[in-house]
Amino acid sequence: MELKTIEFIKEHEENWRELLKDIPYCLTINENDNYAIFKYSQTGSDFNEQICKECRGLIIDKNILKPIALSFYKFFNYGEQFADKIYWKDCKVQEKVDGSKMLVWYDAYENKWQISTSSQLNAYEAKVQDFNITFGQLFDKALINNNLTNNDFYNLLDKKFCYTFELVSPESRVVIPYKQADLYFIGVRNIETFEECNTLDFMDICNKIKTPKQYPLNNLKACLHATECMGYDEEGFVVVDSRFNRVKIKSPAYVSAHHLKNNSTVNQSRILNIIENGEQEEFLTYFPEYKEYFVTIEDKLVEYKNNLKLAIEDINFKMEHNDPCLPWTRKDFAKYINQTYPQYSSMLFKYMNMDLINLFIDNQWSKLSKEDKMKKLGLKYEQEEE
């Protein structure tokens, strides 16, 4: 079956570039003399359109209008509108590697293997942000770290297939820190049939390059529970079934870390949430670059709580020493609080309205077992029938 993208180009030979760059597709297109690579926009592309799902680094030969390379179609987090339906009886739950997708494919015009990113045909021209290095150079470093030369690596490959790898490195870090440049073998596609293949059928590569860890999980509930137990050094899972349907299941900790920066601005509310959950020590183990932000916000939190405590002590003192000859009314206390402690007024009003002794008693009583409650009341405890 022909790709929708190819069909569209054939139907709009004169202006396919302009149309595909415009809504509803909003594709980025990069070209050289023979090839074009297509990448969707995460925010602009309409994923109701199959074309947008296909264009996740799709490479076509412009001369013959044939797809030359593609890793996976766009896939989504479970629960999202466009997420694939997974056949759980026959699926694999794999580690979600937190890296950059790299596509390796054979160039028949140049008679050599090429390495592309998801948006650039030549990975050696794709600069890593904030570093004087390209993704192609990082790929080479990763091969060296796996004791492979480029020739050794290319000798493992078959021209009838295109191959997908996940590249991780300190320089190209997304969220999770990796100590050195490395590769994970994550996908293969037959370019003659354009059907996806099982990576485990390519053991020559699997024996030389890492593959994602696999987990003995076979349902959504088990996967969700497992992600809740993950730390900040794991992204989550990719679930792929025998039909190559895929969904992502990300850990809450990873999502929190990933969204810690919004448009290069640190999200202070997320830092506060991590502090309140008591997870700052674990978080800073993996992301020490955020320490000064945590110190600042934690100091502000401690200061706020200490000042609130002093305000409560002041109100308690005034309530206990209220002059019986000229007593303060609730209105007088409200006026004093609003004038003296405007930042804490809502909490102080709630405090004054609380019956703290009974609140404490009720809280502790609710924690007792039925047997303990009966004993404390001097009553006989009888086991209830199920």
Describe the residue ranges of each PLM region:
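Core nucleotide-handling region used for phosphoryl-transfer chemistry
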Residues: M1-E386
